[in-house]
C-alpha cells in the first residue's frame, strides 16, 4: 500500500526544503576550442568517472570526478544522442533516439551489441523487434535490461543479459501501466523498476515482469531519474520546472534545488541525472549545453 501513495500533501509540505548541495563552477575541463552540444545524457562508471553523451562534434566524452578530460569517442554511429548508462559489465549502453536503436560499446568505443535500428525504420508499439524513439536503459540485478520506448511508442521492453527479447508492456494512456512519453528507467536495491512517465508527470513502479506496483504523482515532470542506494532515494530532474528533486520511497519530495536560468546552479531543460558513489550529482542540460556537478 505504501507504494500506492500519491503523496500529494506530503510533497507540498516538504517541497520547500532545499537540498544541501552547491554547484561546482566550470567543473568540466574541455580541451581548448571544444564545446558540448545539447547534453542529453550523463552517467558515472565504477571509478566515478563521468560520461557525457551530447549532440556536439564529440559525441561521448569521459571526465574524471574532478572534471579532468580523459578521452572522447567522436565516431559513434548515432543520429541523435539520448540516454546513457554504464552497465554492470563496465560497458557503455547508449540510446540513439533518432536511429531507433540501443548500442552497447566498450569504453574504447567498439560496438559490442546493437538492438533496433533495422534500416533505421521505427517499430510500432506491438512489435518485439525494435523501437520508435527510445530513451534510456536500466539493469536488473540479474543483468537483464529494460529499455524505455519512448517518445512515440509507450512501453517498456525487457531483454535478457545477452540481448534476447523477453517481454514488453505498456500503451499510450493515463491509466496504471499506461504511459505518455516513457523517458527514463532505473532500478532500486530491491529490484523494483521506476519508470519516468514524463508527460503524465508521474513515476510508475513495476516488478521485473511488468506487474504494476504503484505510482508517484504531484512530483513535477520526471525527465531523468537515478537511484542513490545509500540514501534509498530517487533523484529526479523536473524539466518542466527546471529543478532537481529528491524523493523518498513513499514518493514524497524531501528536497528540491534550482530554478530556471543560465547561471551556474540554474537549469534550462535538465534532461538527465546521475549520482556517483560519494553522493555528488551530475545534471545534463539540453538548452544550456552543459553538465553541472553538485556537491554537499
Language-model segments: which ranges?
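Eukaryotic scaffold repeat domains enriched in small/polar residues
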Residues: 16-296
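A generic membrane alpha-helix/interface feature
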Residues: 1-3, 167
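Sec-dependent N-terminal signal peptides
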Residues: 3-12
Amino acid at each position: 500500500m505504501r507504494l500506492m501513495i500519491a503523496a500529494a500533501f506530503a510533497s507540498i509540505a516538504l517541497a520547500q526544503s532545499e537540498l544541501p548541495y552547491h554547484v561546482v563552477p566550470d567543473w568540466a575541463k574541455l580541451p581548448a576550442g571544444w564545446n558540448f552540444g545539447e547534453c542529453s545524457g550523463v552517467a558515472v562508471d565504477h571509478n566515478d568517472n563521468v560520461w557525457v553523451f551530447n549532440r556536439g562534434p564529440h559525441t561521448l566524452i569521459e571526465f574524471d570526478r574532478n572534471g579532468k578530460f580523459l578521452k572522447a569517442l567522436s565516431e559513434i554511429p548515432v543520429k541523435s544522442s539520448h540516454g546513457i548508462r554504464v552497465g554492470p559489465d563496465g560497458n557503455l549502453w547508449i540510446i540513439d533516439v533518432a536511429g531507433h536503436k540501443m548500442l552497447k560499446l566498450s569504453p574504447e568505443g567498439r560496438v559490442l551489441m546493437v538492438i533496433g535500428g533495422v534500416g533505421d525504420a521505427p517499430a510500432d508499439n506491438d512489435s518485439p523487434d525494435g523501437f520508435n524513439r527510445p530513451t534510456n536503459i536500466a539493469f536488473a540485478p540479474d543483468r537483464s535490461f529494460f529499455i524505455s520506448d519512448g517518445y512515440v511508442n509507450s512501453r517498456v521492453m525487457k531483454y535478457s543479459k545477452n540481448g534476447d527479447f523477453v517481454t514488453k508492456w505498456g500503451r499510450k494512456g493515463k491509466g496504471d501501466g499506461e504511459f505518455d512519453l516513457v523517458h527514463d528507467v532505473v532500478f532500486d536495491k530491491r529490484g523494483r523498476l521506476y519508470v519516468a512517465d514524463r508527460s503524465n508527470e508521474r513515476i510508475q513502479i513495476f516488478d521485473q515482469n511488468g506487474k504494476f506496483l504503484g505510482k508517484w504523482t504531484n512530483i513535477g515532470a520526471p525527465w531523468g531519474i537515478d537511484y542513490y542506494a545509500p540514501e534509498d532515494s530517487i533523484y529526479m530532474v523536473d524539466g518542466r520546472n527546471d529543478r532537481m528533486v529528491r524523493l523518498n520511497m513513499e514518493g514524497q519530495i524531501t528536497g528540491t534545488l534550482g530554478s530556471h536560468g543560465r547561471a551556474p546552479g540554474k537549469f534550462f531543460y535538465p534532461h538527465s541525472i546521475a549520482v556517483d558513489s560519494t553522493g555528488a550529482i551530475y545534471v545534463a542540460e539540453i538548452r544550456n549545453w552543459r553538465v553541472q556537478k553538485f556537491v554537499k
